Every structure is written in C-alpha cells, then in structure tokens.
Amino acid sequence: MGLVALLLIFLFAAMFVAVSVVSLGAQVFFPEAFNGVAAGLATLIKEIIYSPTIALVGLMLILPLAAFVFLRSKLIPRWKPWIMLALLLFLSLSVSGINVVISYIGNFFTTSLAEKDPATFWRFMWVYAGVFIIASPIVVVYSYTRDKLALYWREWMTDSFLDRYFQNRAYYEVNSQKEIDNPDQRIAEDIKSFTSTSLDFLLLMLGAVIDVISFTGILWSISTSLSIGLIIYAVFGTVVMVILGKRLIVLNFNQLRKEADFRYGLVHIRDNAESIAFYRGEAQESVQVKHRFLEAVRNFNLLIGWQRNLEYFTRSYKYATYIIPSLFLASIYFAGEIRYGDIIQAEFAFRQVLEAFSLVVYKIESLSAFAAGINRLATFNEFLRDEKNAVELEVRTIDTVIGSQLMLEHVTLDTPKHQKTLIRDLSVAVQPGEGVLIVGQSGAGKSSLLRAIAGLWDSGTGRLVRPELGEMLFLPQRPYMILGSLRSQLLYPNSSSEVDEEKLHHVLASVNLADLPERLGGFEADLDWAEILSLGEQQRLAFARLLLTKPRYAILDEATSALDLDNEQHLYEQLQATKTTFVSVGHRVSLVKYHQQVLELLGDGSWRLVSTEEYRCSAKVFG
C-alpha cells in the first residue's frame, strides 16, 4: 500500500503539471473560450508556480520516482501490473477532471439557452464535442485497464493461495477445520470477487476524494449554505446505513456458505452416483440436497427482506438530492445573484460530492457482500500462513526422524486432538526388501498407522524413523485418478517424467492391462478415469505406477481388495521382484504368504508382531 500511495502522490503532481501546461497554453491560444470556462484557473496556477508550494510539487515528483528506482529490482518481475496500475490511476484522475470540465460547459451551455445567446451556445457546443471526442476513448481504456489489472491481481493471488494450499499438505489438514468450509469456493470464487471488487472500491475512493476536492470548491463558490447542508445530509445517510448494514454483512456471509454447501451436496451426488444407485438411496439424497437448498433459500429470503428495507431508505435518500439544491438556491436565483447555469452546475456538483460522501449509502449491498467475502478469505489466509495453524497445537507429538529404513520405536498413536489412543508402545522394524502385513479388526488403527507413517497424523509419543517421503509410494484402497491423460495417470505423481510408450506398454502388460491404450484412445487420451475404469482396473493401474516409480518403500492400504486372487498373486509377485520394501494393510488370508512378518492390531491399543508361519498357525485367526 505504501508504493500505491507514492504512486498516487506522483500522479497528483504530474496531473498538476499537465493541467498547468494545458491551461496556460489554452489561455495563450484560445483566450476567449478558456476565460469563459475557467477564468481564474490560470491565475491560480501562476500563483502556485511563483510560491513556495511549487517546491512541494517538485518533491511529490522526485521522491516517488526515487523510491521506485531504489526498489526497481523487486518491481521489475511485476512491471506489467505496476504500469497498468499507474495508467489506471492516471485515467481515473483524468475522468474526474473531465467531469469538472463538463460541469463548467453545462453551466455556460444552459445559461446561453436561458438567455437566448446563440453565439455562446454554439461555441460551447463545439467545446463539448471536443471534450466528448477526448473523453470517450479515455473512459473505454479506463474500463479495459481496470478489468485487465483485476485479472492480473487474481492470477497472482490465486497462484499464491494454491502454492500454500499444496504446501505441507494443507489441503489435507483443512478438512479438520470446521470454520474453513469449501476451500474450493474460496480459491475459485472469493478471490475473483475480492480482486475485482477491491479494485473497484479503490478507484471509487480515489474518485470520491478527487470529486470532493474539485466539486466542493465549485459548490462553495456558488452557495456556502448548500455546501454545509450537503455535509450534514451525507453524514446522516452514512450513519444510518452503517447501523442498518451490519445485519446485511452477516446475511451475505451466511449466504455464501449455504450456497457452497448446496453446490457441494450436488457434487457429492455426482461423485457417488453409482453407490447411490446400488443402495437405491435417491429419496434420502433428494431430502438432504433439498434441505441444503431450502437453507440457502431461507437465508436469501432474509437477505432480500433486509435489502428491501434498505432500498426504502436509499431510494428516498437519492430522490431527495434532486430537490435539495433547488431549495437552497431558489431564493438567490430569484434575487438575480446567480445565473440559471449556476443552478445546473450546482446540482451536478452537489450530486458528485454527495455520491463521494455517501459511498456507504449507495454501495451498502456491495460492501456487505464484499465484507463477507473478505472474512472468508482472511480466515483461509490465516490458516495457510503457517501449517501449524491447520490443527490445534498438540501437547504430544510423535518424533519423526529421516533415516535409511522404516522403523517405529515405542510409538503410541492417538487420533487427532488426542481423543482416543489407537496403538500403545509399538516397536517394529521393516527390513529392507521384505514385507510386513498389518491386520486387525475394523477401527483397530490399521489405516491410521499408515497416516502416521505418511506424516499426516503425529498425535502421540515415540519415535518414527522413515525415509524421505519422495522415496515412498502410498497405494490407497481407492486409487486417486487425476484429471489428465493415460500417460499422466501412469507417471503420477511424477507426470513430467519422460518415458517412452514401449515401456508404458510393457508395464501395463505386467499388470494385465495391455489393452487399455487401444481400448481407450491411446496414452494421450484425456478421460474421466475414475468413472471409466472399474475399481479393479484402477488398483492395477496404481500398481503400474508403482512399477514405473520404483520407490524404495511401498505402503499398500488394501490395494488389491477389488482383485481376484490370481491378479492379486500376479501383482505381489511383480512387487517382490522389484526388491521394494513394502507394508500392506489387508483382511485377506491370501496376503500372508507375500510377507515376512504380520503385525496384528488387537483393537484395545495392544498388538503383536509374529512371523507369517506363526500367524498361519494361530488358532485365533483361522479357527
């Protein structure tokens, strides 16, 4: 914001220089027209030039330039947005200047009509035509530059949020934050609204300041009492709208959340359509999604009710502005102290200054929606600022150490926030090239232990030694199918790797998916893979990723649950041939033979670690 302020200071000074040059030039070459529009402007400019004030103007030009030169190394990478911001602010000043000129032209134009003075009428008609020719492209370029700068800002801000969203697995941790709902909407929609609306309000505020400075002088020169009445009227309207607008901010915030919840319900149905169809759960799904919609409708009814009440006030407030200037000026006009054109100019200036003073009144609905969006972005930004904010500070955490093998030493694993202890005092080492199978009843903590190994959970005590996560590959029960080509699916998460098609064909054949490229359009086919492939095909594709990636360690969470025994055996034999060390979670007895050790979680926090031979002989498991 400091650089923006310096830029504004520089532009104000530059605008003064430009106005001075144009005004003094116009007085020399077009004295009659210039003196008719702004007789005292050239005199005022000369007084400033020959006074100490000119030194201040010089400083306003030199100091911002020096600051920008000093910071040029930081600004060069983003020079386009800064150039566009400077152009936009300059155009904003120009538009305000044009409005001032038009107010004077309107004064003389209407006075000439009232006094039946054709010479003055046609002279200012030509002046207005010239201003129109100049103003039209300025206004068009102003609108284009504003939208373009908002787009640049959105691009930068979205990149920043996305970078932090994917750092330290914040996208995973955000699910535990109840106050941060629908992060997708905050990134996709709230940032877009924030950037465009913020820029609009910045320009509105700048225009308001310029209008107050410019038109208050005009208004004061015509009627002091009207100027004072204007200030009182504007303050009254602003106070009333601030009081009434507080409720509107809350309703807008709730509306954003409820609309996002409704949309999420529809997306959830789309993503789980097959499961819903199998369960014949249409009636229940319809009830829940309609409930979300009715919540949005109920809140919107409250919102439009408050908007209606505000509209009563804002309409009355606005309509009164058409009569107030005439009430103040009628007596002095009838007394012959001002011309008819002065009334027209005063009305124009009155509305310009009133709009500047009454931004809260006229923009209360936009401001309330904007405030709600800022609140949502602020909480999300606070969460992303530091990954430690993603979860509450833990009293006890598992100490994770990067080492050459996978080993747990006296690990006690709790659920997040320490609500429940899942495993107590676990010690196990996975020998290189071997496999460990984790078994146990549902809820015993099998998948939770994998989350701890992956660094997703750290609630508890003890010491976890593991390789870098880049040396490990996790295969969940339902593999993640990315949005991309078949090649990208196979190479994920290293989609930029260069692998020839012959090798890709070979790997697919090794997991019994040799026909996949020909059947679905080749390796560059971009399809909805989660919908097209069965769960069994997805699991085999995940094994193909493993064979291509060749990690030192593989963590498999029921990664073959949808496969028949022959395919399961084939894939585990392929895995064993790579000499990859692996940890599996599963329920099938058939998995035991592919591992050297079995870790059984007994469900009460206790556990036992046995060889596969001992586990096979266990009467507890096999009855």
Question: Where do the PLM segments sit?
Answer:
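Primarily ABC-family ATPase nucleotide-binding module
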Residues: 38, 42, 179-180, 381-437, ...
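A hydrophobic transmembrane-helix motif
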Residues: 90, 134, 138-139, 203-245, ...
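Juxtamembrane loop-to-helix connectors within ABC transporter transmembrane domains
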Residues: 168-212, 271
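Loop segments that connect adjacent transmembrane helices in multi-pass transporters
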Residues: 251-304
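ABC ATPase nucleotide-binding domain helical subdomain, centered on the C-loop/LSGGQ "ABC signature"
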Residues: 471, 487-528, 572-573
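ABC-family ATPase nucleotide-binding domain "signature/switch" substructure
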Residues: 489, 523-623
